[in-house]
Amino acid sequence: MNRKYRKTLIAGNWKMNKTPSETKAFMSELKTILPKGRWCDIALCVPAVCIPTAVRAMRETRVGIGAENCNANASGAYTGEIAANMLLDAGCKYVILGHSERRAMGETDKDVNAKVLTALENGLVPILCVGETLEQRETGITTEWITMQIKAGLNGVAEDKIRKMIIAYEPIWAIGTGKTATPEQAEEVCESIRAVIRKMYGAKIARAISILYGGSMNDKNAYDLLAQPDIDGGLIGGASLVPEKFVKIIEAANQPTI
C-alpha cells in the first residue's frame, strides 16, 4: 500500500490524567523538545477540564488538541455531558469516539455512531476506535467483530465525510496491560480494516483514510509498528503522558523508511 496517499498521525490519549496546571507544565516542556520542521501530524486528546489550557499553550504549534468523548446531542438536559459544538468552540480539532474504556461502561455501537455523525456535522475529526477482546481473538472472530464495529460506527456517514475520519485499531487485550500486538498481528487487522472501507466506499477512499494502532505503542516498539504498510500512526496512551517518550514516537514516525 502506497502511504503517499495518507497522513501519519501520532495522537496522545491522556485518559483521566493530569490537571490543568500539570497540562501547562507538560505543554511547556513539550514545546522545547518538539522536533522542528515538517513532521507528521500530532494530536493530544486531553481531559475536558484541560482543553482550554492545552489549546492556549499549543496555539502557535502544529499540535492539534482533541477531546476524549462527546455527547451526540447538541444541547439539553444531559448533566455532565459535553456537546461537539462546545468542543469545537473551545478549540478542539479531534475527538476520540468508541474507545473500549467507554464501551465497557455500556456505550453501544449505536451510541458511537450517533457521536460520529454529530462530530462530523460540527467539524471535528472523529477518531473511531475498534478492537477485539482476547477471547474474541482466540476464537478467531477478530475480523468479523471489527467489521461489524466499523459498519455500525460508519452507518450514515457520507462519502464526503468519511475522508475526514480516522480509524484506530485498539486490541482490548493490549490496552494498559503491557502486552502489544506484534507488528504482523497489528498489520493484519489494519489491512482488514482498510479492506472493509474499500468495500464500503471504494478503493480511492480506502487508500486515503488513516488507520492508527492503539495498543500499548511506546517509544520502544513504535518504529516496528509504524513500519507496517497499513499502520498510519498511533493512538498513544501511557507514553503520551511523558514528553520525552511522546517525542520519541513522533521521531519514529518520521524516519525516512516509514
Description of each model-found segment:
Residues 1-258:
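Active-site loop-to-helix "anion-binding N-cap" substructures in soluble metabolic enzymes
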